[in-house]
Amino acid sequence: MEKPQLALKPTIMAVLNGNSFAVVAALIPAALISQLLKALPQTGLVGQVEVMVALAQSTLPLIAAFVVGNMLRLSNLETASMALATFVASGVVTVKGDAYMIAGTGVILDIMLTTLIASYVARLSSRLLGQLRMVFEPLVVLLISGGLGLLTLPIMVAVQGAVGQVVAQATRVSPLLMGVLFGMLFAFLIVSPLPSVGIAMALGLSGVGSGAANAGIVAA
C-alpha cells in the first residue's frame, strides 16, 4: 500500500467529507422512522426497533473515523486506532459513578477535531514505531488524540449549544419571520460542519419551520 501523505488540504477535505457522510449514515435511520414508531402501539418489537435506531446514532464517531481513514487510505490499524480515540473523545459516553452510559451522537465539532488530530498521530506513529506499531499504536493514538479531544470537548459543547440556542430562539417569533430566519439559519448550517439533521430532530421541526428549513437547505 502506498504510504498516505501528511498534506493538510486533502486531510481536511477527508475529515469534512467523512464526517458529513457519518452524520447522514448514523442519523437517517432514526430520522426516517422515529415519528412513525411513536404512532405505533408500543409493543416489544417497536421498542426494540427504537433501541436499534438510537444505538445507530451513537456510532457516529466510529463511522466518521473509519470513513476518514478510508478516504486517507490508512491501514486497518491506523483507522481502528483513530476510531478508538474519536469514540472516547466524542461525548457519546458519560460516566456516572461506576456506570458508563452511551447516549446521543456526540459533539460533531469535537468528533471532527479528534479525527483530524488522530489522522496525523496515527500516520506519524506508524512511521516512528515501525514493527512495534501493532502493539503500541492504538495506545499512542488513544492517549494523545483522545486526550486532546477530551480537553476540547467542553469548548465544543458550548459552541454547538450556542448555535442550537440561536436556532431555538427563532421558533418563538411570528410564523412569517420564523420562516425567513429558519431559511437563513439552515442555509448556513448545511454548508457548515454542524449537523443540520441533528438540530432539526432535536427541535422537532414541523409545519412552517420545517418547510423554511428545507427551503434554506435547497437554496444553499
Where are these regions (language model features)?
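Pore-lining transmembrane helices
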Residues: 1-220
